[in-house]
C-alpha cells in the first residue's frame, strides 16, 4: 500500500468509528508512513514508560499525562504546536492506544488537521494473565524500537 492508500484506510476507520481526528493506523501502517517520511510519530506516554519500557527510535516524547498525574497536561497541545505545524501528519502513540486517542482528540480540537492515533500502542492490550506485549502493539509487530 502506498501512503495515499494508508491515509485513506485511516480515514475509513475515522468514519467507521466516528473518531474526532483524522484517523487511526495499525503499528505496521504507521511504520510504513514513518519509513517513507510521510509522517512523524510522537510518544505521549510518561517519561518512565519511555525510558524503561522502550520507545520508537527518534520519536519525541510529549507526555499526555505525567507519571502519577490525575489529569492531562494542560500544555500538551501547546507543546505539540511548538514542535510541529498544525497541518503535519502526526502519529500519536501510547501504551495501548487509549491515551493517544484522547491526545489526538485534544489536538484535533486545537486545530491539528492531520493527527492520527496508532492503534494497539507500543505494548498492546493485556493478555489473559494481565501481561502486555503479547496481544498487538508496536513491539509485538516486530517493529524497530530502542531502550535506554
Question: Across the structure, where does each feature detected by a protein language model lie?
Answer:
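Rhodanese-like catalytic fold shared by cysteine-dependent sulfurtransferases
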Residues: 1-39, 47-89, 100-148
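Short, surface-exposed ligand- or partner-binding patches at beta-edge/loop junctions that are enriched
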Residues: 92-93
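Conserved G/P- and acidic residue-centered "switch" motifs that form tight phosphate/ATP-binding loops
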Residues: 43, 97
Amino acid at each position: 500500500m502506498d501512503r495515499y492508500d494508508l491515509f485513506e484506510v485511516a480515514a475509513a476507520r475515522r468514519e467507521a468509528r466516528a473518531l474526532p481526528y483524522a484517523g487511526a493506523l495499525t503499528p505496521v501502517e504507521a511504520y510504513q508512513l514513518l519509513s517513507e517520511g510521510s509522517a512523524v510519530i510522537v510518544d505521549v506516554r510518561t517519561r518512565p514508560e519511555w525510558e524503561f519500557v522502550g520507545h520508537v527510535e527518534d520519536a519525541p516524547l510529549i507526555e499526555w499525562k505525567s507519571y502519577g498525574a490525575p489529569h492531562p497536561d494542560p500544555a500538551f497541545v501547546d507543546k505539540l504546536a511548538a514542535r510541529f505545524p498544525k497541518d503535519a501528519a502526526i502519529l500519536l502513540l501510547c501504551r495501548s492506544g487509549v491515551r493517544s486517542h484522547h491526545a489526538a482528540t485534544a489536538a484535533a480540537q486545537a486545530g491539528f488537521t492531520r493527527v492520527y492515533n496508532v492503534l494497539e500502542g507500543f505494548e498492546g492490550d493485556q493478555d489473559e494473565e494481565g501481561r502486555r506485549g503479547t496481544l498487538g502493539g508496536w513491539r509485538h509487530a516486530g517493529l524497530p524500537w530502542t531502550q535506554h
